[in-house]
Amino acid sequence: MKKISLLGATGSIGTSVLEVVRKFSDQYRIVAMAAGRNIDLFARQIEEFSPDLVSVLDEEYAHCLQERLGGFRGKILWGNAGNEEVAAYPSASITISAIVGAAGLLPTLAAIEAGKDIGLANKETLVMAGKIVMERARRKGVALLPVDSEHSAIFQALHAGKRADLAKIILTASGGPFHGRTAAELAQVTPAQALAHPNWSMGRKVSIDSATLMNKGLEVIEAKWLFDVEPENIEVVVHPQSIVHSLVEYHDGSLIAQLGVADMCIPIAYALSYPNRLPLGHKRLSLTDCACLDFIRPDTENFPALPLAFEALRRGGVAPAALNAANEIAVAAFLDGKIRFLDIARLVTDTVDVVSPGDENKLDDILAADRESREITRQKITELF
């Protein structure tokens, strides 16, 4: 029986993790769970999976949860400290890091320090502090198993050859709901339109990132650290069908790809069962139903978030952390109707250009850049809009 700590239980990834655990309850048990504000759903999850420890956003939500649960015999915590305790829960052998955003960094580090293998869905952990995270994981001897469909695809394709023979990795992007739109059209899009992803069911923040291509930019940075490749050896192509989840190219010209339906339970199950595979029984890909597979160069002029991420990666230091923080604030402002779609990338650019320099080897510098970037972006929104 593999015991699991789950961070971000009520989100899109978290609910999919629980779907897999529910199906294979003879092999997996949830022993600790953390969530944010969705107390109704979290209470139902706790009643079903009976964890020993849970954590929520703050003390007020903890009291609400206690009232909802009544006879719950486990421990209820809250805040960052609660998330970190869930992440490092002693009896868990793997921690699934599925909190959205920078909030996932410190709990993931806590899990690593506690010697837990990590099922990594929180890409911001490596975007912000990739060097620190990878060094600590190596020191502790823990496995970082990708849960993102693209990074899971690369992880699987890398088993087909030797790392010394790797030429490049190719990340596929759906292109989001606005693929092919002009700048004039993008200037008019609404949050509701941006949230309507054509292929995947995702949370609100990730859906907007997919629409701007920032999600793919963050995945580029994640891939650099996870697979130890340089930016010039990472390529992004738009693949509207979302069937080829990513590819690896070797020096002999071979391209190894992982294909499948758009179902997050597949990479989640692989991370939980690695190196084995689980018979999910979900819908499978029928190759004869694939009329065509398109691969297109990204439109980096109308979707500048992708080259912004590459540039932040090349700059190094705290630039990726600043990029991520500014984007989180800008996306929230767009969802609240305070700024327009095209303003997101502009705000990120302006913030990254002025944030104080810092050392990527120092966690305090990274966290300081995160705080400063958020404040700068908020000020710009207040002043300009």
Curated annotation (Swiss-Prot):
1-deoxy-D-xylulose 5-phosphate binds at K123, S149, E150, S174, H197, S210, N215, K216, E219. Its EC number is 1.1.1.267. Coiled coil: none annotated. Pfam families: DXP_redisom_C, DXP_reductoisom, DXPR_C. InterPro entries: DXP_reductoisomerase, DXP_reductoisomerase_C, DXP_reductoisomerase_N, DXPR_C, DXPR_C_sf, NAD(P)-bd_dom_sf. Mn(2+) binds at D148, E150, E219. GO terms for molecular function: 1-deoxy-D-xylulose-5-phosphate reductoisomerase activity; manganese ion binding; NADPH binding. SUPFAM superfamilies: 1-deoxy-D-xylulose-5-phosphate reductoisomerase, C-terminal domain, Glyceraldehyde-3-phosphate dehydrogenase-like, C-terminal domain, NAD(P)-binding Rossmann-fold domains. Pathway: Isoprenoid biosynthesis; isopentenyl diphosphate biosynthesis via DXP pathway; isopentenyl diphosphate from 1-deoxy-D-xylulose 5-phosphate: step 1/6. NADPH binds at T10, G11, S12, I13, G36, R37, N38, N122, E124, G203. It catalyses: 2-C-methyl-D-erythritol 4-phosphate + NADP(+) = 1-deoxy-D-xylulose 5-phosphate + NADPH + H(+). NCBIfam families: Dxr (TIGR00243), PRK12464.1 (NF009114). Catalyzes the NADPH-dependent rearrangement and reduction of 1-deoxy-D-xylulose-5-phosphate (DXP) to 2-C-methyl-D-erythritol 4-phosphate (MEP). This is 1-deoxy-D-xylulose 5-phosphate reductoisomerase. It comes from Desulfotalea psychrophila (strain LSv54 / DSM 12343). The lineage of its organism: Bacteria, Pseudomonadati, Thermodesulfobacteriota, Desulfobulbia, Desulfobulbales.
